[in-house]
C-alpha cells in the first residue's frame, strides 16, 4: 500500500467515525428539542438543519485544507444534518392536511438555513 493510498483509507475511516458522531449528536439534539416543544411541528429536525447550516458555513469560511473539510463537512455535518427527514416530515404534515405547517417548514428551513450559513461564514472571517 502506498502512502497516498494509506492516507486515503485513513481519511475515509475518519469520515465514517466522525459521521457516526454526527448522527448520534443529531439523534440527541432532535429528541431533546422534540421533548420540549410541540409534537405537531418538526422542531428537532429544524434545529439540527439550521445549526448544521451555520456550522457548515463556518467551516467554509475557514477555508480548511481539503482533507479537513472532508472530515468536518462531509463526515460530521453531513451526518448531523438531514435533508431526507426534513422532506419526509414535510410530506407527512401535508398528508395530515397541515398545509400551513408544511409550507412553513419549507420556507422557514430555507430562509433560516441560508441566514445561518451566511452567519457561520461571517463569523469564520472575523
From Swiss-Prot:
Summary of activators and inhibitors of this protein: Na(+) is not transported, but it plays an essential structural role and its presence is essential for fluoride channel function.
GO biological process entries: cellular detoxification of fluoride; fluoride transmembrane transport
InterPro entries membership: FluC
GO molecular function terms attached to this record: fluoride channel activity; fluoride transmembrane transporter activity; metal ion binding
Catalyzed reactions: fluoride(in) = fluoride(out)
Compartments (UniProt record): Cell membrane
Membrane topology type: Multi-pass membrane protein
Binding positions (Na(+)): 78, 81
HAMAP family hit by this protein: FluC
Family, per entry: Belongs to the fluoride channel Fluc/FEX (TC 1.A.43) family.
Job description of the protein: Fluoride-specific ion channel. Important for reducing fluoride concentration in the cell, thus reducing its toxicity.
Name of this chain's protein: Fluoride-specific ion channel FluC 2
Annotated source species: Mycobacterium tuberculosis (strain ATCC 25618 / H37Rv)
This protein's encoding gene: fluC2
Amino acid at each position: 500500500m502506498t502512502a497516498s493510498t494509506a492516507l486515503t483509507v485513513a481519511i475515509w475511516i475518519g469520515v465514517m467515525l466522525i459521521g457516526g458522531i454526527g448522527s448520534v449528536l443529531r439523534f440527541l439534539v432532535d429528541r431533546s428539542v422534540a421533548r420540549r416543544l410541540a409534537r405537531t411541528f418538526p422542531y428537532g429536525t429544524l434545529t439540527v438543519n439550521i445549526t448544521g447550516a451555520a456550522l457548515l458555513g463556518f467551516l467554509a469560511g475557514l477555508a480548511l485544507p481539503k482533507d479537513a473539510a472532508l472530515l468536518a463537512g462531509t463526515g460530521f455535518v453531513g451526518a448531523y444534518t438531514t435533508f431526507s427527514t426534513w422532506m419526509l416530515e414535510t410530506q407527512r404534515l401535508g398528508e395530515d392536511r397541515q398545509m400551513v405547517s408544511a409550507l412553513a417548514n419549507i420556507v422557514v428551513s430555507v430562509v433560516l438555513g441560508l441566514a445561518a450559513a451566511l452567519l457561520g461564514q461571517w463569523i469564520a472571517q472575523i
